[in-house]
Amino acid sequence: MKILVINCGSSSLKYQLIDMTSEQPIAQGLVERIGIEGSVLTHKVNGKKYKIEEEMKDHKKAIELVLNALVNEEYGVIKNMEEISAVGHRVVHGGEKYAESVLIDSEVMEALEDFVKLAPLHNPPNIIGINACKELMSSTPMVAVFDTAFHQTLPDYAYMYSLPYDLYEKHGIRKYGFHGTSHKYVSAMAAKVLGKNIEDLKLITCHLGNGSSLAAVKNGKCVDTSMGFTPLAGLTMGTRCGDIDPAIVTFLIKELNYSVDEVNKIMNKESGVLGISGISSDFRDILKAASEGNERAELALNIFKNKVIQYIGAYTAVMGGVDAIIFTAGVGENSEPIRKRIISDLGFLGIKLDEEKNKVMGETETISTEDSKVKVLAIPTNEELMIARDTKEIVEKNNIK
């Protein structure tokens, strides 16, 4: 069985064609600058890259070129579209309605449109991608895999805000959490690495990248997570502010005369480690500047570390202990110095870092010592494979041939 995984951004599209026998991608690629001049498709097969430069006015045209690339005589990997058993779509927001992945039908599409108000930046391109695929592959089953679904197991006292209850009832204002597909994947992988049943474990998964979030996973279920109603809450991120006093928003608007759009831009695009350091949103640049004595770069790293430690401490308390802490995503998987900074302050949990093993980049490794009371793992996330697994499971459950 071959599953096509599609992840649509506002002007980009990532894809993988995964052979479910080996669970390996047989082709993958990225389309950039959709609807903008200079659009390009980079298609990868067997370690070789092929660039297709063609005007792509919309996502439909982009997906058309992706499908053409997959069957191309020179760099294609399948003979025809019938070889694709199903398409798995990453959808950022599934609201309260979807606690798991779902076969896409007209009712699901209506619900996705309804969730646009909850994810105005992310859900529209997801919907456009689904519609484009439906037009081009009308007989192929489509599955929606939601970033929010894994967090739907949060108890009410963890997802409710202390706001008037009718704001939740009428407008769905509550914590949803994001990066769920990644947290789900690495928590399952951690159980495998530890040789234990996930139902018997208390895990803290740290998805650290330009966007970052933590999740508390107790007995295989997410019981808390750091992002909230939107992906702006929680940790200090690349350009996002994370948790701040909400009254700062009204202060900026009333006292400093910022518009709502300006405040939104500041908090989403100009804050985080970029805003503090004044250098970059890339942790590699900030680490370099800090090593050269830049005080604001060092401050940005300390604020980031402090937030991660606060959440690890809180989630250890929430779960009544922790068996393992997992680092994943761009920074979590690849940054030895960031992991070291965080782990060095977790000695109170009986954690001991193996300095040599912590040098790992992009591979699965236990980076704590043998006698560390709490295990620490670095595990590369694989959201595409998780989407493909969910898609396969749903197609088989619905007996779709």
UniProtKB/Swiss-Prot annotation:
Q: Which cofactor does it need?
A: Mg(2+); Mn(2+)
Q: Which PROSITE patterns match?
A: ACETATE_KINASE_1, ACETATE_KINASE_2
Q: Does the keyword Cell inner membrane apply?
A: no
Give the main location: cytoplasm
Gene3D superfamilies recorded = 3.30.420.40
Top-rank taxon of the source lineage equals: Bacteria
Q: Which PANTHER family match?
A: ACETATE KINASE, ACETATE KINASE-RELATED
What's the protein called, per UniProt? Acetate kinase
Q: Which organism is it from?
A: Clostridium novyi (strain NT)
Q: Which gene encodes it?
A: ackA
